[in-house]
């Protein structure tokens, strides 16, 4: 049976503001819990007017306090910006506050423009090459494994708690899959970023998986854009907005927020742009609840996974809520 989860990037709608976007993320998490979604993850983006979620740890804490059962996590913390020790302590605090409900999703992407990376590293170089070593150290801190031979002998992360957050690595390449496998972590493939070749990447993760304190068996899931509506016409209107938003991002066109369908419906595109839009449709599933369910089940079969994480970006928050309600209805039938 397929389980459904949500990744929300706190998108700001054109004409709205970041405060509203963050409040809508919290409201969506509460609705997701009521609807029966398994996880609710929030993202990390910097120096962005369009995406308000810059500090997943803070947002997770608030969402966890406003919900009761749903797992809450990061999708993800961009670890190369930070000290593995500090991340371990942040997530131990979260786990201590809500035991058994916290997921620590990790990534190596910058999550923003180079100037933001420089600022996050106080003008120093962001060294993503150290990411595998950071994963090892983070694991030690989360599970009290730093002994007297560690570079910080016998260092433990506070608070000292009896449980640990579930660790997931996020990625869209074979390199990230191999690192997740070698670490014993869960692996979330970002189909919404890379719509091609993910099936083989997930199979590679499962083949190369090594049990560790992070997990005894492989845990694989796939994240994909989904836009679900009552009619095909409405779904395609939502799709047209996401088409434009993704294309604008590729072309470096600054957006004040996610536009409305009325703002993009008369757009014309060059042959090259039309090809890019068609290619980007491989990253998303658009349609009625019956159509979306059929394609999500096919995606689940292709990836050989029973968990799908859904990313939905719309101008109107009501359209997003409706999409998630219809999706859950489809899988309840």
From Swiss-Prot:
Family membership: To bacterial alkanal monooxygenase alpha and beta chains.
Top-rank taxon: Bacteria
Any one of the GO CC terms: cytosol
SUPFAM superfamilies: Bacterial luciferase-like
Protein name (database record): Uncharacterized protein YwcH
Pfam families reported in the protein's UniProt record: Bac_luciferase (PF00296)
PANTHER family, per the entry: LUCIFERASE-LIKE MONOOXYGENASE
């Amino acid at each position: 049976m397929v389980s459904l989860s949500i990744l929300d990037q706190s998108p700001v709608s054109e004409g709205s503001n970041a405060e509203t976007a963050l409040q809508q993320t919290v409201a969506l998490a509460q609705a997701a819990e009521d609807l029966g979604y398994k996880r609710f993850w929030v993202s990390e983006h910097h120096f962005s007017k369009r995406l308000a979620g810059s500090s997943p740890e803070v947002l997770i804490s608030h969402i966890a306090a406003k919900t009761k059962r749903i797992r809450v996590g990061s999708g993800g913390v961009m670890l190369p910006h930070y000290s593995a020790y500090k991340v371990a302590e942040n997530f131990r605090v979260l786990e201590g506050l809500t035991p058994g409900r916290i997921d620590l999703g990790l990534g190596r992407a910058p999550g923003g423009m180079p100037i933001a990376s420089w600022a996050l590293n106080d003008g120093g170089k962001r060294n993503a090459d150290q990411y595998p070593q950071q994963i090892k150290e983070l694991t030690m801190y989360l599970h009290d494994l730093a002994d007297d031979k560690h570079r910080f002998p016998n260092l433990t992360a506070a608070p000292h708690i009896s449980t640990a957050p579930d660790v997931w690595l996020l990625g869209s390449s074979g390199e990230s899959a191999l690192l997740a496998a070698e670490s014993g972590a869960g692996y979330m493939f970002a189909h919404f970023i890379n719509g091609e070749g993910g099936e083989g990447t997930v199979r590679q993760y499962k083949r190369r998986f090594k049990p560790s304190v992070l997990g005894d068996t492989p845990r694989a899931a796939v994240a994909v854009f989904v836009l679900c509506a009552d009619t095909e016409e409405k779904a395609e209107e939502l799709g047209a907005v996401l088409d434009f938003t993704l294309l604008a991002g590729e072309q470096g066109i600054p957006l004040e927020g996610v536009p409305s369908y009325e703002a993009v419906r008369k757009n014309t595109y060059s042959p090259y742009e039309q090809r890019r839009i068609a290619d980007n449709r491989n990253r998303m599933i658009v349609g009625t609840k019956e159509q979306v369910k059929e394609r999500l089940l096919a995606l689940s079969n292709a990836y050989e996974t029973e968990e799908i994480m859904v990313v939905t970006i719309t101008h109107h928050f009501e359209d997003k809520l409706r999409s998630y309600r219809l999706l859950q209805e489809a899988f309840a039938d």
